[in-house]
Structure formats: structure tokens, C-alpha cells
Amino acid sequence: MPAAAQPSWWRLELEPPGELEESLLWRLESLGVHRLAVRFRPEAPEQRTLQAWLPEVDWPEPERVALAEALAQMAEPFGVALPSLRWELQPEEDWALSWKRHWQPDPVGQRLLILPAWLQVPAEHAERLALLIDPGSAFGTGSHPTTRLCLEALEKRSLTGSRVADLGCGSGILGIASLVLGAREVLASDTDSLAVRATAENAALNQAGAHLQVQLGSADVLQQLLAGAPADLLLCNILAPVLTALTPAFSELLTARGEGLLSGLLVDQAPALTAHLEAHGWRVTTEAEQGRWALLAIQRA
């Protein structure tokens, strides 16, 4: 009796516009695509390739066409065209190797290390603080410049004993990093149920579940989690239009002397967002930039 044929996988590739990368990852996850990676060379971090692996049996041509249409519709509000999608069939063993091979230990800043959960800390990074992440969650794995900007900003701050609010938590990596760096407690929320699940799972991987609470919702839910005791630090790594819409809620989430770290915005969006924040009573500084992306720090004026 002949051996059963090995299943094959579609490998999907595209070069995402920077402002679309995180949203594409989220949309693919919501459409049932759970094996994702973002490839880039350290010397050229802006040249990025998004890759996804899909079981051939589950994704015949009509399903792949529908997927492309859904991604194109998602790109329309951003005013950019979705790049062409490239499809290639891979045998089972090639897929298994390809997916995990693209995730390697990733040092960030001076002290942090993003570590895929199945790997050990390399000897050369033994002194770094490891953040265990399941890249299959597709949310904020740390490769995106805005996530790295936030992580680098966190390690510059004294977080010992602080209370942190993470609005739009994605994978939970920023909240987990806050705990690793000394925060006492993290309260987190996201409007995507997949992100809430990813945050909870990644917190468990890092044995941080007892100090990180996450719920489905936006600023109102986060305010409820804070239970009348505002945070010392607010993290919000979301697109600029969402930051604009959420600005009125920031004063309810932070103590009088608290600080917010806002990213997810492009450098050329920073002036308008800064003016908007200042009009709502915030003192704003552009703390850092990486490529086309910016990080703003806010405190009450």
C-alpha cells in the first residue's frame, strides 16, 4: 500500500507598507492564518517581508482570492495599495523548518532579549532579561520598529514598584517587559479577542500571569481594571488616528505625575498629534525615532 502523500503548505509573501504591517498581521490572524513571520536584515530594518504559511488543503484558490480581497479592503482606509501577494507551495517538512527558522533570539536595547518560547537563551545573551514570546500569536512580536521603540524607552525608566496600564496590548510584550524591569502590576486591554488571548498566554509563558490582568475592551475597560487607582505609566502602541481618538481618556488612566509612552505613529504624523495632545493639557516630547516611526512621551502640562 503506497504511503500517504505528505501535506503541502502555501507560503505567502508580501512587502507590507510600514503603516500596514501590524494591521496585516492582526487581520491574517483573524482570518485563521496563525503561522506568520516578518523577515528583515538588521542592517536594513525598513526592508521587510511578511510571510505566512497556510495548509494547502484548507486554502484552495477561491479561499486565497477571498483572503487577498479581505487584505486589500483592510488597506483602503490607509490610502495605500496592498502589494502583490506571492504564493508558493512547500512540502510539510520545509514549512516546519521555515516557520521556526525565521524567529531567532532578538536583543533589544541594552538589557532585553525577545526569545521565541522554544529556544534557550544563547550564551552571548546570558546577562539579558528574556521576554518569552509565542510568535504564532502574530501580535507585536518585537520586530516592528514601534514595539522596539517602546521596549527601549521602558528599559531607560525606573519601573520598580510601578503600576502600568497597557492600552491596546497586542501580544502583551510591553506589559511583560515592564514586569521584567521591575513593575509591580500591569493592567491591560485590547479590543481584539485574539490579542487578549495572546497576552494571557505570553504572560503565562513568562510566569507573569499573577501580576498581569487583561480584558477585552478599550479605555473604559482599562479604567475599570485600574479600580480608581490610576497608573504610573501608560503604554499605548496604536495607530495615530486611534491615539487621537483616545486622548481624552488618558487623564483618567494616569496619576497626576504619571507618564505616557505613545507609539504606532509615523514621524510625519507627530506634529499634528503633538498639537492635539497639547490642546488636551499634555506636555509632549518626541523621545525617539526609528526609520519612519516615532515615540512620544507625555506628562501633564
UniProtKB/Swiss-Prot annotation:
Q: Name one GO biological process term.
A: methylation
Alphabetical keyword list: Cytoplasm, Methyltransferase, S-adenosyl-L-methionine, Transferase
Question: Which InterPro entries would you find in this protein's record?
Answer: Ribosomal_L11_MeTrfase_PrmA (IPR050078), Ribosomal_PrmA_MeTrfase (IPR004498), SAM-dependent_MTases_sf (IPR029063)
Q: Which domain of life is it from?
A: Bacteria
Protein residues bound to S-adenosyl-L-methionine:
147, 168, 190, 237
List, alphabetically, the CDD domains matched: AdoMet_MTases
- Which E.C. number(s) belong to this protein? 2.1.1.-
Write one Pfam family the protein is assigned to.
PrmA
Catalytic reactions of this protein: L-lysyl-[protein] + 3 S-adenosyl-L-methionine = N(6),N(6),N(6)-trimethyl-L-lysyl-[protein] + 3 S-adenosyl-L-homocysteine + 3 H(+)
User: Where does the UniProt annotation locate this protein?
Assistant: Cytoplasm
Any one Gene Ontology MF annotation carried by this entry is: protein-lysine N-methyltransferase activity
Which Gene Ontology cellular component terms are annotated?
A: cytoplasm
The record's similarity note reads: Belongs to the methyltransferase superfamily. PrmA family.
Q: What does this protein do?
A: Methylates ribosomal protein L11.
Q: What is this protein called?
A: Ribosomal protein L11 methyltransferase
